């Protein structure tokens, strides 16, 4: 019963409690434990499974991106839960509509304080997202067509010889036609990619409309790419909690090859999720969760 009802999660900062070979009998024999060797420097190592519900969580992203309470957290909240973003990023047509709306708003409604290449910065962010996910295979072609086709004449945008000031409907139709040529591979979009896309689109939307200033949310946004690359190396999204249903009593999470900043974040995410899971699903108090954080002063 002890083996069935007790769960031990050991956060191992320095690689003292698990070694990557079949003779790993540290603490208990290998058959009684699950081992995760996480790494922020290599992309072919283990990834710790966390459920989708944890990814769609404001606290998760606030911790990861170091969001400030007053301005950055509300921006993150709208990025995660705004209905149009959540629903439209599920489909190819929805994503194209979001991209078109963002571009048309930048080009036709953006304030004069916007960078003149703000639309290109937006496409560059989609290009970066594609580099790590392959969700937009021809984004470079679309970006180059818009970059070469758009010109300004005394503050008036011209797209492939169509002046917005003279023929606004034709201008927008041409813009939509170019956006429609974007190829979207939804099979490459996991929960991390979807949320990063929501944050990108929301950032350019709220800056263009003047709801937020770059000074307030820019620092958070600038952390997005590096944190996204790190988090996708160490966590895998699963719809079924493989750790909870796993009957092995000991889980060792080896953080020896994880950078200092992520060493602080990973234990917070793991501990928060499993503590809340057991609190909610263990009302009869028959199961026991034991979280052991070795070298805990590293994150306290």
Give the location of each predicted region:
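Short, flexible helix-coil linker/hinge segments at the edges of structured domains or between repeats
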Residues: 30-32, 40-43
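P-loop NTPase motor domains
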Residues: 2-3, 8-10, 14-25, 52-300
């Amino acid at each position: 019963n002890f083996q069935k009802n007790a769960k031990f999660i050991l956060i191992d900062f320095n690689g003292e409690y698990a070694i990557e070979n079949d003779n790993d009998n540290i603490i208990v024999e290998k058959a009684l434990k699950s081992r995760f060797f996480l790494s922020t420097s290599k992309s072919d190592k283990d990834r710790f499974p966390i459920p989708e519900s944890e990814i769609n969580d404001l606290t998760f992203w606030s911790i990861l991106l170091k969001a400030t309470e007053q301005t950055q957290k509300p921006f993150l909240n709208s990025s995660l839960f705004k209905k149009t973003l959540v629903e439209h990023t599920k489909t190819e047509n929805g994503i194209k509509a979001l991209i078109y709306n963002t571009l048309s708003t930048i080009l036709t409604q953006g304030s004069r304080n916007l960078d003149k290449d703000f639309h290109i910065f937006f496409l560059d962010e989609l290009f970066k997202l594609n580099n790590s996910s392959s969700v937009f295979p021809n984004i470079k072609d679309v970006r180059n067509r818009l970059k070469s086709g758009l010109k300004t004449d005394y503050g008036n945008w011209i797209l492939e010889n169509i002046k917005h000031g003279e023929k606004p409907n034709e201008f927008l139709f041409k813009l939509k036609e170019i956006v429609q040529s974007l190829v979207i591979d939804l099979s490459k979009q996991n929960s991390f990619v979807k949320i990063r896309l929501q944050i990108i689109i929301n950032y350019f939307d709220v800056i263009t409309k003047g709801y937020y200033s770059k000074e307030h949310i820019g620092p958070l946004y600038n952390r997005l790419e590096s944190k996204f690359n790190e988090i996708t190396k160490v966590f895998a999204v699963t719809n079924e909690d493989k750790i909870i249903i796993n009957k092995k009593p000991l889980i060792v999470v080896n953080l020896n090859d994880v950078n200092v900043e992520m060493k602080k974040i990973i234990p917070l995410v793991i501990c928060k999720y499993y503590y809340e899971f057991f609190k909610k699903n263990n009302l009869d108090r028959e199961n026991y969760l034991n979280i052991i954080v070795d070298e805990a002063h590293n994150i306290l």
